[in-house]
Amino acid sequence: EMRRKALWRLREEQPEGQRRLGAQLKHDISVPPGKLGEFIDSAKEICNNLLPGVRINPFGHLGDGNVHFNLSPPKGKIDFSELDDEIYSRLAELASSMSGSFAAEHGIGRAKIIMADKLRDPIERDIMSKLKKSLDDVLNNVGLTWNNKIKALPKSQQN
């Protein structure tokens, strides 16, 4: 029981520990559980090629293939937001290429709508749009559909 509690404490303290490192780029990714190790290795390589020394903190629901693939700046660098779009795009494409998703447990919402249009099959987008409309057309994210007509939130307003 003590070991279980200690492991949970480590998991629960991850976000706070990372906040102490400064700015963060957060990614909510899912891939089939059997591909998680491959995803993490490839994603680390992508991130290190784009920003040598970046501090990578993958954690989360690893048993079901969901991972918070969060990044903190290299030591001595305060802001690295200029690479946010490039890193996000590359990680999203990697996850999709592995039959995964760039929008795991936190969903698509307004922040990821453009990526959904870019990476999701048109038939899938159509089904998702019809399903959303039939379930909550007037409740949540009114007007948000998979058609690029809704402007994504600026990065500063996400998360």
Predicted regions span which residues?
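Short proline/glycine- and acidic-rich turn/helix-capping motifs at secondary-structure junctions
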Residues: E1-R9, A103-K118, N147-P154
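C-terminal substrate-recognition/cap domain of FAD-linked oxidoreductases
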Residues: E1-R90, L94, M98
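Residues in flexible loops and secondary-structure boundaries
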Residues: P15, G37-F39, D64-N66, N70, ...
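Gly/Ser/Thr-rich helix-start
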Residues: H61-N66, S101, I108-R110, L144
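Short amphipathic alpha-helical interaction segments
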Residues: D79, L83, I87, I108, ...
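Alpha-helix capping/hinge segments and adjacent helical runs
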Residues: S96-I108, K133-N141
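Activity-critical C-terminal alpha-helical subdomain
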Residues: I113-N159
